[in-house]
Amino acid sequence: MALKDKVAFGMSLPHRSPDPLDMVAIRHVARRAEALGFRDLWVTENALDHVYSFDPVGILTYAAAITTRIRLGASVVVLAVHSPMNVAHQWATLDRISDGRAILGVGLGNEHHYRDYAVPKEGRVRRFREEVEVIKALWTQPKVTYHGRFYQLDGVTMSLKPVRTPHPPIWMGVGHPDALRRAAKLADGWMGSGGSSIAAFGQAVPALRAALQAEGRDPDKFPISKRIFMAVDENPEVARAQLHRWFTEVYRNPAGTDASGIHGTPEQVRARLEEVVAMGANHLLLNPVSRHAEQLDALAGIVGLT
């Protein structure tokens, strides 16, 4: 059975790189991924970054304008550095422009987000929950009254609503047990980060499924995904070298080459993807790190889309 018949596949836009960003490559990947049958396109948010990176809403709006069917997601937007009111409006706008194709991935963020943006860490989990609740309320209610610890809204109106009902899906990430329980309660999908190991993903999935069951939700109907940084080449040493450069320069973690990424010949890459599917994934985000047009077609063949 082809991999495409077991799980859905997303494709990363080439929006973050140690090399200057290439709009020709972004345009090609967006259109070609849609034509090949990938389900969604994804980006990350990294404004203060030591490598080149586009704003997620801006580049997804561009992708929306040059495609018609493929879904458009960010994994993840760090809510702590944004107003949830602005996030709700931006993503309602993107959902309108794309005719209901937006997927909002959200996260708590890391230490550097709170330091660089001068955001207090105190109460960050409570604030994150309130931000998700405020976004959902603004998307679904004609007038919003919300009294939380961090956000106070009294009869406010955001007239622009998303196309998608009840609202665009909200995905979460991170494999900490508390984060998995939050995802089971608040989210519409979960994606393991590209920097986390494949082994950690395998450990997180059973805990997430148990948390979903505890919330009375069907784990088989809940998107469980993993972003995988990838390099495929008939010469496995070439593939590994490309991925090693990525993890060294972007993540500053060369060990991620083997622990978190997948590299090798087409046969080796397919075998590793099968292993991740066997861990419980029902969606995989493939993230080539170079030669994007060539890698896109190669990966489409590996998973059975061509």
What are these regions (language model features)?
Residues 1-66, 168, 289:
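N-terminal beta1-alpha1-beta2 module of alpha/beta enzyme domains
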Residues 33, 37, 63, 94, ...:
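Conserved, mostly hydrophobic/aromatic
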Residues 20-33, 86-90, 172-185, 242-243, ...:
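Short, acidic/polar
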Residues 2-22, 81-146, 150, 193-194, ...:
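Flexible, glycine-rich active-site loops centered on histidine and acidic residues
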Residues 7-13, 41-43, 72-75, 102-106, ...:
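Hydrophobic faces of well-ordered beta-strands that scaffold small-molecule active sites
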Residues 50-74, 127-134, 138, 299-306:
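Alpha-helix-loop-beta-strand connector modules within alpha/beta enzyme cores
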Residues 1-18, 110-115, 147-167, 233-260:
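N-terminal small/glycine-rich loop or linker at the start of catalytic domains
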Residues 11-24, 77-85, 164-175, 230-231, ...:
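Active-site mouth loops of central-metabolism enzymes
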